[in-house]
Amino acid sequence: MMSGAFIVFEGADGAGKSTVCKRVFDALTSKGIEAVVTAEPTHTKVGAFIRSGAAGGISQRTEALLFVADRNDHTEWIDEEVSRGKIVLCDRYFASTVAYQSARLDGDSTDRDWLIRINEQFIGKPDATILVDIDPRVGMSRVGTRGEEISKFEKLDFQDQVRSNYLDLAKSY
């Protein structure tokens, strides 16, 4: 049996993470390699709560902790799949929480360090993390062409900060 692996695709909204993830999945499975695709927030109870928007009105730190709780459950599932020899392809993981939540917390380095510390307790280390980088203006235009509603995470100045956070994280890890 082939040994499994955990590969993460990170990047701002509209960067193409989901597309790249799907293409890698298709390439692997066409060669008979067992692979699964997952994403964060997940579809667990905590992930569904985050996705529903019902968490609106809570503090930014509490929201960040919800993402950590979702990731804790997700990591257990990922570890099981990898131990079964599967390649797990994940659309967003740890870096997304740090990039987005630290932007919401005004990019303060103390908040960024706190986000890293609370996440490191619960995350599995990916075998590879691929940052799909894009100019936020291009990403925003892609999001707009999907016909989706622009969320609080998709304003241009916010996406500029998110991209900066991702690039800083890429230098650190």
Predicted features and spans:
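Extreme N-terminal, non-catalytic leader segments
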Residues: 1-6, 34
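Hydrophobic anchor at the beta1->P-loop junction of P-loop NTPases
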Residues: 9
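Walker A (P-loop) phosphate-binding loop of P-loop NTPases
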Residues: 14
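Conserved lysine of the Walker
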Residues: 17
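Hydrophobic positions on the alpha1 helix immediately C-terminal to the Walker A/P-loop
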Residues: 20
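ATP-dependent small-molecule kinase phosphotransfer cores
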Residues: 27, 31-123
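Short glycine-/polar-rich loops that comprise or flank the Walker A/P-loop
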Residues: 33, 124-128, 172-173
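A glycine- and Lys/Arg-enriched "phosphate-lid" helix/loop adjacent to the NTP-binding pocket
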Residues: 97-164
